[in-house]
């Protein structure tokens, strides 16, 4: 997309609430209840995406098509996949899909080959028994997810992740490691991220304290600013390239995944890329009614902007996917947590929900009470594998049963009459049964998806992550917001820099602080020196 077409797009932009297609969509969504007798399962890149637990009607499907058409879905999707400028506030492409293409361009291929050779050499020399991965946000969550899901492949090599500026995190990240056989992987797109650089400095001190003469030889950098990393001291041969068109929350597909290759295997990276590429193809080619990311996005719009659900629960019924929750949390909330539309006006409908969750069955004993009987409730994405890898059939059978049962309970609910009958059948006196039955009522009709993976393979995980990426893109398109920037993150970082200088006594306290901030700056000044 050139600057002329970008200008044209902005000039022709219409806020969502002004579109007659949106009014028709709202009416159809409000009159499209969940039907427990209807089955809707979509096949996408080897995943089964069961959207039977969402409201549906032919009228809603037709209204969704009209809404996507007025938003020029097919053209904007092509721009995304072809490297056009879709991140309009920063004037960039969001071409992370090119990083997982089977036959990428020469520059991407070169970085892939460099990454592969680095891992091959480290493996052949049995070097770097400990990896400390330093990065935050998108430079951390995706790699952490992959390593914790598949990290069993390298029993002789350990990976630890440090993201937080809290020094306790860095102390724990280095504890017990041999500095002489530890590689520090620093991932930062700009190579100016405070948390990453400060933790990197601590790592250098730790290496020097162990008597290592050239500590920078133990550092690898992944960044879009190789010049800055080299100036910091990282040898050029150990700097891997990012591109400015790779957003942080999509950087898993880039050289940031070096730690995945070292801790797991390069086959894990290749498998995830292949699965994601298969989902890209599905997203590009499948009809709207059969397109899993599109249909999940439409349901998400209905649940948030029409039905008013303020949050989305992620419930992976696989312990290895514990880190999937914060990964999706960042992807959805950093992408869709916006209230300004593309033209600079305010979006007059609710946008991105709060995303939260934890693996089942732990979740059932933590917050499922709220999901079933709370006054608000939330849509739930259940994610589970058909086959397990532990070999304990009974454990997996019970896990699957719990996943299916929780979803069915949310869908079907329990009426007062059924609850009363249950109490009476248990031999309860009539008056007590009539009273207690009210406490056992489950509203039901609460939306959910069930995403079934064949098993937790790199291919399936890659497809799953791309499914959510494209879902988020479509939701941003419909709402008319840019899902590829994060100005809300930047604002706080600027304020933190100033306050840090005030706490250190380097500058006077800003008289423009609110009363509470001014009080705590005064109270905490000099704390870091004590």
Name each region found by the language model.
Residues 52, 350, 354-455:
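Helicase-primase coupling helices
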């Amino acid at each position: 997309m050139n600057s002329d077409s970008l200008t044209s797009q902005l000039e022709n932009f219409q806020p969502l609430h002004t579109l007659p297609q949106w009014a028709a969509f709202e009416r159809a969504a409000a009159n499209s209840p969940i039907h427990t007798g209807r089955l809707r399962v979509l096949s996408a890149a080897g995943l089964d995406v069961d959207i039977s637990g969402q409201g549906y009607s032919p009228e809603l499907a037709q209204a969704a098509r009209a809404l996507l058409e007025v938003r020029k879905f097919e053209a904007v999707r092509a721009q995304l996949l072809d490297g056009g400028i879709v991140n309009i506030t920063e004037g960039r492409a969001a071409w992370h899909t090119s990083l997982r293409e089977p036959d990428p361009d020469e520059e991407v291929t070169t970085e892939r080959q460099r990454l592969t050779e680095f891992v091959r050499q480290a493996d052949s020399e049995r070097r770097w028994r400990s990896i400390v991965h330093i990065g935050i946000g998108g430079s951390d969550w995706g790699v952490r997810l992959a390593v914790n899901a598949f990290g069993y492949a390298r029993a002789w090599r350990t990976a630890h992740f440090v993201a937080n500026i809290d020094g306790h995190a860095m102390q724990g990240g280095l504890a017990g490691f041999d500095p002489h056989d530890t590689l520090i992987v620093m991932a930062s797109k700009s190579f100016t991220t405070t948390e990453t650089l400060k933790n990197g400095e601590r790592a250098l001190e730790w290496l020097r304290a162990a008597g290592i003469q050239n500590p920078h030889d133990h550092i690898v950098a992944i960044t879009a600013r190789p010049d800055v990393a080299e100036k910091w001291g990282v040898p050029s041969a150990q700097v891997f390239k990012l591109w400015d068109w790779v957003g942080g929350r999509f950087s898993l597909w880039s050289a940031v995944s070096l730690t995945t290759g070292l801790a797991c295997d390069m086959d894990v990276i290749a498998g995830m890329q292949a699965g994601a590429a298969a989902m890209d193809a599905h997203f590009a080619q499948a009809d709207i009614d059969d397109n899993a990311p599109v249909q999940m996005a439409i349901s998400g719009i209905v649940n948030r902007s029409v039905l008013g659900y303020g949050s989305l629960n992620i419930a992976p019924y696989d312990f290895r996917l514990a880190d999937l929750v914060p990964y999706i949390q960042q992807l959805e909330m950093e992408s869709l947590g916006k209230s300004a539309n593309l033209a600079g006006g305010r979006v007059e409908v609710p946008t991105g929900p709060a995303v939260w969750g934890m693996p089942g069955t732990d979740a059932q004993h933590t917050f499922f009470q709220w999901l079933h009987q709370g006054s608000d409730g939330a849509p739930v994405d259940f994610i589970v594998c058909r086959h397990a890898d532990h070999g304990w059939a009974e454990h997996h059978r019970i896990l699957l049963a719990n996943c299916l049962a929780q979803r069915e309970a949310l869908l079907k609910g329990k009426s007062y009459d059924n609850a009363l009958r249950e109490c009476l059948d248990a031999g309860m006196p009539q008056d007590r049964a009539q009273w207690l039955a009210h406490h056992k009522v489950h509203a039901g009709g609460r939306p959910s998806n069930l995403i079934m993976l064949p098993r937790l393979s790199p291919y399936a995980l890659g497809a799953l992550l791309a499914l959510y990426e494209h879902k988020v893109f479509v939701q941003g398109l419909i709402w008319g917001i840019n899902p590829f920037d994060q100005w809300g993150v930047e604002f706080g970082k600027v304020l933190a820099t100033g306050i840090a200088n005030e706490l250190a006594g380097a500058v006077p306290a800003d008289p423009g602080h609110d009363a509470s901030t001014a009080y705590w700056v005064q109270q905490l000044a000099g704390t870091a020196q004590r």
